[in-house]
Amino acid sequence: MKIAVYPGSFDPITNGHLDIIERGSKVFDKLIIGVLVNVDKKGLFEIEERVELIKKVTKHIKNVEVLSFNGLLIDFLKASNAKIILKGLRAVSDFEYEFKMALMNNKLDPDIETVFMMTSAQYSYLSSSSVKQVAKFGGCIEGLVPKEIISDVIRRSKI
């Protein structure tokens, strides 16, 4: 069974993330969305909320599981019996960073492989940071995040 982990902070999950999840779920037998606890950032949503939002927008995908983790990604993969890291790429700048991370992860565990998936062109500009910025100033986020969570993002952005 090919089990992959798609890690990220997903704060909030965007349509670009969902695109990678939907496409990745067709490539792997099981896709675990690893929602990371980033102690260096104060998130828009708490970790438990992010997990629930992702579950809400991925409930139609049967081979997806959503879990939170902290610590090393490699340790999370081992605990999940996964050998593959799935990463979405928007631009060359993403590749430079992710390539270095893939090399580090492979150094920590040579059995781990990183698979890069290009984001669909219509989402190549999209990031959680840009969604938060637009929502904070009252801009329209339709088409940027899944429709099921638009009200959650707007409500939280006004706090």
Swiss-Prot record:
Listed cofactors: Mg(2+)
Subcellular localization(s) per the UniProt record: Cytoplasm
Pfam families: CTP_transf_like (PF01467)
EC number, UniProt record: 2.7.7.3
Molecular function, one GO term: ATP binding
Site label Transition state stabilizer, positions: H17
InterPro entries, per the entry: Cyt_trans-like, PPAT, Rossmann-like_a/b/a_fold
Gene Ontology CC entries for this record: cytoplasm
Pathway named in the protein's UniProt entry: Cofactor biosynthesis; coenzyme A biosynthesis; CoA from (R)-pantothenate: step 4/5
Enzyme class, first EC level, given as a word: transferase
UniProt record similarity statement: Belongs to the bacterial CoaD family.
PANTHER family xrefs: PHOSPHOPANTETHEINE ADENYLYLTRANSFERASE
Name the UniProt record assigns to this protein: Phosphopantetheine adenylyltransferase
Major site of localization recorded for this protein: cytoplasm
Keywords carried by this UniProt record: ATP-binding, Coenzyme A biosynthesis, Cytoplasm, Magnesium, Nucleotide-binding, Nucleotidyltransferase, Transferase
Native source organism of the sequence: Clostridium botulinum (strain Eklund 17B / Type B)
Binding residue positions for substrate: S9, K41, L73, K87
UniProt GO BP: coenzyme A biosynthetic process
Lineage: Bacteria, Bacillati, Bacillota, Clostridia, Eubacteriales
Catalytic activity: (R)-4'-phosphopantetheine + ATP + H(+) = 3'-dephospho-CoA + diphosphate
